[in-house]
Curated annotation (Swiss-Prot), chain A:
Chain positions recorded as Mn(2+) 2 binding sites: 142, 327, 380
Name this polypeptide is given: Protein phosphatase 2C 37
CDD domains, per database record: PP2Cc
Family the entry assigns: Belongs to the PP2C family.
Binding site residues for Mn(2+) 1: 142-143, 327, 331
Residues flagged as site, Lock: 280
Keyword tags: Abscisic acid signaling pathway, Hydrolase, Magnesium, Manganese, Metal-binding, Protein phosphatase, Ubl conjugation, Zinc
Phenotype when changing residue 287 to E: In ahg3-1; hypersensitivity to ABA during seed germination, and loss of phosphatase activity
Residue span(s) of domain PPM-type phosphatase: 104-389
Curated annotation (Swiss-Prot), chain B:
Protein name per Swiss-Prot or TrEMBL: Abscisic acid receptor PYL13
Pfam families per UniProt: Polyketide_cyc2
SUPFAM superfamilies, per database record: Bet v1-like
InterPro entries the record matches: Plant_def-hormone_signal, Polyketide_cyclase/dehydratase, START-like_dom_sf
Domain topic, free-text comment: Upon interaction with ABA, the 'latch' and 'gate' loops change in conformation leading to a tight dimerization and the creation a surface that enables the receptor to dock into and inhibit the PP2C active site.
Annotated stretches, region: START-like: 3-160
Site entry (Involved in ABA binding), positions: 144
Length: 399, 164
């Protein structure tokens, strides 16, 4: 980490140009800071101060995914398979082989200043083969009320999506993802807080307190920002206020739009459903929930719905990386800044010649972004996934 | 003096519950266990037991309530002003917290429903509270009524489950 920081500080890179057409740009609350300043903030890691009286100070608990070790070995294994396939197959063209590798990724999830960890991250490279193409699944889920809805999304959503995509006609991604999210929502609703049903084994590692106090079950929900990456496309499905941002040639392109209750079209939808948005520590549905869409939260239906907004983006040679993160990051770090940080880390690893270096660069980017969020007094859990979208050369050295 | 400048508002929420009065009252009156039926309460610890009575039951008892994440507040400090097991009346004041509810005082009264004295209970929760700065009286009442209604709906579900 120190090495990366030292290397980056030496660079004199101009700030990433602002995309004036980006809605996120118009909404950003912080000025774009010089990249060196950003790194300095993170490198120094100033002591976390409890500026906000409403938040209790908690020790920052940094935790990578419990399955991270498996994830590493899976990625390595998939790389070997991919290279083997390329080597043995005469039908694969050079262009296609560029995209056949599993993308390198980095991810971090930290509790931050919140009392509990309610975020969850789901990484499933090569979770689906379709039309001879490898599909990869990445998801970030920011729970509220309790953690079990986000945990359930982490466990199940990729499998639900896989089953829906397998029966998908042509490329109807929007319909398929909406159906998947609705099934996920139904699934979390039907299971009474993971209580044992018909002798079925409890899937949760640790029982959450909702089992003991069922009235709270209805008030639990989660955001879900999900990306399915194929050799040619990036499909993003978003429900809630987590976010996906594409870094393309230094420019931050939002692939999702936050579902805030005071977003004009969401406000109209809620009112037409008979609901109401009240400003109580921010805009909230019925004065209670600060987002207009979520998985779960049965008590707020039909005002809070689980339907995602879906974007399908063609991949290009200029794509650098994709960042999926919870609002613990985006509330304090603008899209452009996050893009700049990730770009610096990836550049430090070169053009992806070395697969291990690229993987480390993504991990460094995710970690650096997380530290930046904490340094900027984020008051929430922070979860970040960085996906390397750059093309990889055929002559990639064996690791 | 300062509070006299603040605009106040008041409202009442009425809920009929399909359960006998003794059962409903036994849950409502447990000042130390609001999480049993209050939807947004995560946990509760007693700060002081007050004079007389058992823990959590004496007049003047104070509880520290931790609220669930996602809710527009993290904690609330509440005092039991009155608890009458004969007239089934409970009065609670909120004396602290980051929910913007200042000078909040609620009175909950439980009576057997005239419809079916043995099986139905009517819960009436009335309150007064300052209207927070920047918020309308209408929105304040809507917000608080909403929370109380959710709590009483949870209470109805809980008692229904307990009677099975």
């Amino acid at each position: 980490m120190a090495g990366i920081c030292c290397g980056v500080v030496g660079e004199t890179e101009p700030a990433a140009p602002v995309d004036s057409t980006s809605r996120a740009s118009l909404r950003r609350r912080l000025d774009l800071l010089p990249s060196i300043k950003i790194v300095a903030d993170s490198a120094v890691a100033p002591p976390l101060e409890n500026c906000r009286k409403r938040q209790k100070r908690e020790t920052v608990v940094l935790s990578t995914l419990p399955g991270n070790l498996d994830l590493d070995s899976n990625v390595r294994s998939e790389n070997k398979k991919a290279r083997s396939a390329v080597t043995n197959s005469n039908s694969v063209t050079e262009a296609e082989s560029f995209f056949s590798d599993v993308p390198k990724i980095g991810t971090t999830s930290v509790c931050g200043r919140r009392r509990d960890m309610e975020d969850a991250v789901s990484i499933h490279p090569s979770f689906l083969q379709r039309n001879s193409e490898n599909h990869h699944f990445y998801g970030v889920f920011d729970g509220h009320g309790c953690s079990h809805v986000a945990e359930k999304c982490r466990e199940r959503l990729h499998d639900i999506v896989k089953k829906e995509v397998e029966v998908m006609a042509s490329d109807e991604w929007t319909e398929t993802m909406v159906k998947s999210f609705q099934k996920m929502d139904k699934e979390v609703s039907q299971r009474e807080c993971n209580l044992v049903v018909n002798g079925a084994t409890r899937s949760m590692k640790n029982s959450c307190r909702c089992e003991l106090q069922s009235p709270q079950c209805d008030a639990v929900g989660s955001t879900a920002v999900v990306s399915v990456v194929t050799p040619e496309k990036i499909i993003v499905s978003n429900c809630g206020d987590s976010r996906a941002v594409l870094c393309r040639n230094g420019v931050a392109i939002p692939l999702s739009v936050d579902h805030k209750p005071d977003r004009p079209d969401e406000l109209i939808r809620i009112q037409q459903a008979g609901g109401r948005v009240i400003y109580w520590d921010g805009a909230r549905v019925l004065g209670v929930l600060a987002m207009s869409r979520a998985i779960g939260d049965n008590y707020l239906k039909p005002y809070v719905i689980p339907d995602p907004e879906v974007t399908v983006t063609d991949r290009t040679d200029e794509d650098e990386c994709l960042i999926l993160a919870s609002d613990g990051l985006w509330d304090v770090v603008p899209n452009e800044t996050a893009c700049g940080v990730a770009r610096m880390c990836l550049r430090g690893a070169g053009a992806g010649d070395d697969s291990d270096a690229a993987h480390n660069a993504c991990s460094d980017a995710a970690l650096l972004l997380t530290k930046l969020a904490l340094a900027r007094q984020s008051s929430d859990n922070v979860s970040v996934v960085v996906v390397d979208l750059r093309k990889r050369r055929n002559n990639q050295a064996s690791s | 003096m300062e509070s006299s400048k603040q605009k106040r508002c008041r409202s009442s929420v009425v809920e009929t519950i399909e359960a006998p009065l003794p059962l409903v009252w036994s849950i409502l009156r447990s000042f130390d266990k609001p999480q049993a039926y209050q939807r947004f309460v995560k946990s509760c610890t007693m700060r002081s037991g007050g004079g007389g009575g058992k823990g959590g039951e004496g007049k003047g008892s104070v509880r520290d309530v931790t609220l669930v994440s996602g809710f527009p507040a993290d904690f609330s400090t509440e005092r039991l002003e009155e608890l009458d097991d004969e007239s089934h009346v409970m009065v609670v004041s909120i004396i602290g917290g980051n929910h913007r509810l200042v000078n909040y005082k609620s009175k909950t009264k439980v009576v057997a429903s005239p419809e079916d004295m043995a099986k139905k209970t009517v819960v009436v929760e009335s309150y007064v509270v300052d209207v927070p700065e920047g918020t309308s009286e209408e929105d304040t009442i809507f917000f608080v009524d909403n929370i109380i209604r959710y709590n009483l709906t949870s209470l109805a579900k809980l008692t229904k489950k307990m009677m099975k």
